[in-house]
């Protein structure tokens, strides 16, 4: 049996924009598959024939071939994204009297047993790791760090092994796990307690994460982001609020954080194309979400496969480890249909021109809604108050997408 390029994922068909449907996309930048198609097809057919013509066997082979054939520009871009993970042995965070215990088994099993025993003996009432509860905070940190990196260094910035960028080192140090750093886990937890009633050791959702980011950004103007606008229950963005910011400073850097739930148990097919469009936008800084109580940081896609960094790998909480591990080419993939419907979408607007361009870009979005003002939001056939709709708990998102489309006159 002879296999075609289409069967093995090398079909160079074009989408509506004239771009290859097989391109890899990283935060708005397209990269072609960098491989010798004829050679890959030849090798694939040899493997397929020897396996009795199994396309499934071939696809496993192609996945391995593909690992060695990424476009160099794609790999450079991926490696330059910032990625944070679980950390161990950081400065202890005291537990709340009515909060989770640091000695819960699901926290302990993921840690080095010696670390777990040491903490149980010397700090039984403190957390010195975020294993089992901090993944949404870590992916929120990743989203924020990449937004800051772009705001300060530009989207074209790339990591160079032979040339350490001191400004980027400073950005990364802001996320070190110590109360003294502005975007540390400690300060996320502190804001989670103040703004979202989250106790140390409790899992954050998109709403708590976005509120913490907004408050921490406001307290640290040196981060390069002038304002952080949060929509915790939908992706509603209000023109009057954004326009007021640009009236005062035309070239403001605005980070938009939009919490959405695009289905019940899984993402509704109605939204799948728009998720790709969000990651394809040059204004995207990624999506935090993934699976129930298991957050991932999505930074790109290829076809129906999303590309992500997984924070669930514990590493020591030292500045040396942080600097060594925050850049990696070790990314994973998931089919878009397997994505959890609750997610936090990040968009960075660098000036009024970006705002106008992005507004036009999402005009027909099924997820993001640009409304004139909050007065345009009506809760038809719903007993919830406006305040409840705009500020739901993490597990009670309201999908206002179709309703807002009706307000905008969209089909």
From Swiss-Prot:
Annotated Gene Ontology cellular component terms: cytosol; mitochondrion; nucleus; phagophore assembly site
Task performed by this protein: Cysteine protease that plays a key role in cytoplasm to vacuole transport (Cvt) and autophagy by mediating both proteolytic activation and delipidation of ATG8. Required for selective autophagic degradation of the nucleus (nucleophagy) as well as for mitophagy which contributes to regulate mitochondrial quantity and quality by eliminating the mitochondria to a basal level to fulfill cellular energy requirements and preventing excess ROS production. The protease activity is required for proteolytic activation of ATG8: cleaves the C-terminal amino acid of ATG8 to reveal a C-terminal glycine.
Region feature Disordered, mapped onto this chain: 390-411
Reactions catalysed: [protein]-C-terminal L-amino acid-glycyl-phosphatidylethanolamide + H2O = [protein]-C-terminal L-amino acid-glycine + a 1,2-diacyl-sn-glycero-3-phosphoethanolamine
Record protein name field: Probable cysteine protease ATG4
GO molecular function annotation: cysteine-type endopeptidase activity; protein-phosphatidylethanolamide deconjugating activity
Enzyme Commission code(s) on record: 3.4.22.-
Keyword Protease among record annotations: yes
Top-level taxonomic group: Eukaryota
GO terms classed as biological process: aggrephagy; autophagosome assembly; cytoplasm to vacuole targeting by the Cvt pathway; mitophagy; piecemeal microautophagy of the nucleus; protein processing; protein targeting to membrane
The gene coding this protein: ATG4
Root EC class: hydrolase
Keywords from the named record: Autophagy, Cytoplasm, Hydrolase, Nucleus, Protease, Protein transport, Thiol protease, Transport
Native species: Vanderwaltozyma polyspora (strain ATCC 22028 / DSM 70294 / BCRC 21397 / CBS 2163 / NBRC 10782 / NRRL Y-8283 / UCD 57-17) (Kluyveromyces polysporus)
Localization terms from the record: Cytoplasm; Nucleus; Preautophagosomal structure
Record-annotated active site: 135, 310, 312
Family to which this protein belongs: Belongs to the peptidase C54 family.
Protein transport among keywords: yes
């Amino acid at each position: 049996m002879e296999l075609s390029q289409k069967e093995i994922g090398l079909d160079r068909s074009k989408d509506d924009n004239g771009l290859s449907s097989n391109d890899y996309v990283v935060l708005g930048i397209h990269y072609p598959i960098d491989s010798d198609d004829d050679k890959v097809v030849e090798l694939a057919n040899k493997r397929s024939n020897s396996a009795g013509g199994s396309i499934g066997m071939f696809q496993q082979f192609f996945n391995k071939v593909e690992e060695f054939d990424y476009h160099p520009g794609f790999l450079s871009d991926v490696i330059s994204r910032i990625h944070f993970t679980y950390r161990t042995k950081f400065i202890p965070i005291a537990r709340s009297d009515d909060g989770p215990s640091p000695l819960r088994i699901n926290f302990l099993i993921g840690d080095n047993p010696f670390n777990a025993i040491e903490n149980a003996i010397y700090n039984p009432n403190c957390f010195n790791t975020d294993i089992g509860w901090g993944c949404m905070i870590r992916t929120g940190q990743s989203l924020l760090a990449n937004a800051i990196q772009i705001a300060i260094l530009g989207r074209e910035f790339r990591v160079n092994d032979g040339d350490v960028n001191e400004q980027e080192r400073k950005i990364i140090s802001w996320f070190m796990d110590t109360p003294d750093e502005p975007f540390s886990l400690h300060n996320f937890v502190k804001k989670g307690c103040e703004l979202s009633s989250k106790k140390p050791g409790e899992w954050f959702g998109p709403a708590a994460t976005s509120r913490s980011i907004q408050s921490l950004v406001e307290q640290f103007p040196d981060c390069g982001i002038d304002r952080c606008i949060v929509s915790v229950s939908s992706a509603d963005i209000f023109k009057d609020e954004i326009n007021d910011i640009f009236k005062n400073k035309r070239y403001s850097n605005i980070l938009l954080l939009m919490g959405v739930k695009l289905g019940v148990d899984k993402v509704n097919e109605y939204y799948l194309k728009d998720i790709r469009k969000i990651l394809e936008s040059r204004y995207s800084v990624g999506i935090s979400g993934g699976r129930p109580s298991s957050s991932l940081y999505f930074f790109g896609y290829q076809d129906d496969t999303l590309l992500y960094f997984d924070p669930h790998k514990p590493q020591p909480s030292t500045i040396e480890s942080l600097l060594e591990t925050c850049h990696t080419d070790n990314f994973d993939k998931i089919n878009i249909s397997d994505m959890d419907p609750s997610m936090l979408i990040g968009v960075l607007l660098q000036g009024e021109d970006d705002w106008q361009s992005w507004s036009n870009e999402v005009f027909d979005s099924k997820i993001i809604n640009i409304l004139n003002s909050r007065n345009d939001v009506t809760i038809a056939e719903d007993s919830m108050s406006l305040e409840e709709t705009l500020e739901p708990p993490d597990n009670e998102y309201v999908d206002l997408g179709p309703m807002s489309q009706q307000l905008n006159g969209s089909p």
